[in-house]
C-alpha cells in the first residue's frame, strides 16, 4: 500500500495496538499474537516460520531457523532466517513484556516443541505469503485497508515525534555519523 493511500485511511499506531487487545479479548489468540509480534518488534513476515523451544534445549542446540525460546523466567526470539540475515547474522530479541510472554505461553501450550507456532485452519504451517494474507484480511476488516509489514512499520515511524527524529538527523550530520551509531553509543548512557 502506498504512503499516500495509507494517509487517506489515517490508521494510527495506537489503533493497531488496541486491535491486538480486541483480538485477544475475542479469543482470536493466534491472530492477536501474530499482530502483537509485528507491532511490538516490527518483524517482517518471517514470524510465520517461528517455532518454539524450551530454553534448556536451546542451550545445546545447533539453531538454524527462527525460534521463540521459552524458559521459566526468560523468553527471547532467536532469528537466523530473515530478509537481511546475511548482513546481520543471528539476532536475539529479549521478550520482557509480561502480557506478550503470557500470550506466547498460552499459545504454545497445546503445541509440541520445535514445531511451527502459526498454523492455518488445516493445521498446516503458515508461509510468509499466508501470514501476509491473513494480516491483510484482518486489517482490512477492521480499518478498511489491507496492511502488510511495511505499512505497519510506516505507521509506527509516522507515530514518532518528528522533532526528535529531525534533531537526531541533524546531530548525525553534524557529528558525521549515522543515527544507528548515535543510538547504540549514547542512549545506553542515559
Regions found by a protein language model. Name each.
Residues 1-19, 85-99, 113-114:
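DNA breakage-rejoining catalytic core of tyrosine-based enzymes
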Residues 9-46:
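Basic, Lys/Arg- and aromatic-enriched nucleic-acid-binding interface segment
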Residues 25-28, 40-47, 52-61, 110, ...:
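Secondary-structure boundary elements
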Residues 32-39, 154-162:
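Contiguous, well-ordered alpha-helical segments that form the cores/surfaces of helical PPI scaffolds
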Residues 49, 132, 183-184:
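Key DNA-contacting residues within the recognition helix of helix-turn-helix
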Residues 50-97:
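Conserved tyrosine-mediated DNA breakage-rejoining catalytic core shared by Y-recombinases
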Residues 88-156, 161:
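Active-site/catalytic core of tyrosine-dependent DNA strand-transfer enzymes
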Residues 162-164, 168, 173-190:
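Catalytic-site neighborhood detector that most strongly recognizes the C-terminal catalytic loop/helix
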